[in-house]
Amino acid sequence: SVEQIVELPVVATIIEDHLVKGAIDILDVRFGSLWTSITREEFYKLEPEFGDRFEVTIYHADMLVYQNQVVYGKSFADVRIGQPILYINSLYRLGLAINQGSFAKAYNVGVGSSWTIEIKKIEG
C-alpha cells in the first residue's frame, strides 16, 4: 500500500530569442550523459544544424556549475574523444555528453528541478 504521494515540481521549458532553458531530468548512469527536459521540438525552435555551436550553461539553484561552447552533433563521432556534444537522445530529448567520458562525473552535475540548463545559439 502507498502511504503518501509526493508531487515533484516540473520545470517548464522556456523559449526566448536564440535561447532554450530547461531542467536536467535524468543521468544516464551507464555513460554519464545528461538528459534534459528540453524536447526535440523545443530545441528545433533554435533552428540547429549539425555542427552548430551552442553556449551551454548549467546551474544548481543559482550557482554556475558549467559554461562552455558545445557542438550539436548527429553522433558522438562528430566530436573528438573527451569533447562535449549536444545530441537528441532516444526519448527525443536534448542530451549532453562527453565523447567516451562521463559528463556528470567530470562536472559533478546532478538531476532534479534545482538543476537547470540553458542552451544559447552562437551566431556566425
Regions found by a protein language model. Name each.
Residues 3, 92, 103, 113-115:
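Generic hydrophobic/packing signal
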Residues 1-50:
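Anionic-ligand-binding alpha/beta catalytic cores of soluble enzymes and soluble regulatory domains
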Residues 19-25, 80-85, 115:
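Short small/polar-residue motifs
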Residues 27, 37, 59, 118-120:
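A structural detector for beta-sheet-dominated domains
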Residues 34-108:
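A conserved acidic, glycine/proline-rich C-terminal tail/linker
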Residues 12, 51-52, 58, 121-123:
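Short acidic/glycine-rich loops and adjacent helix/strand connectors
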Residues 105-124:
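Conserved glycine-rich phosphate/nucleotide-binding loop
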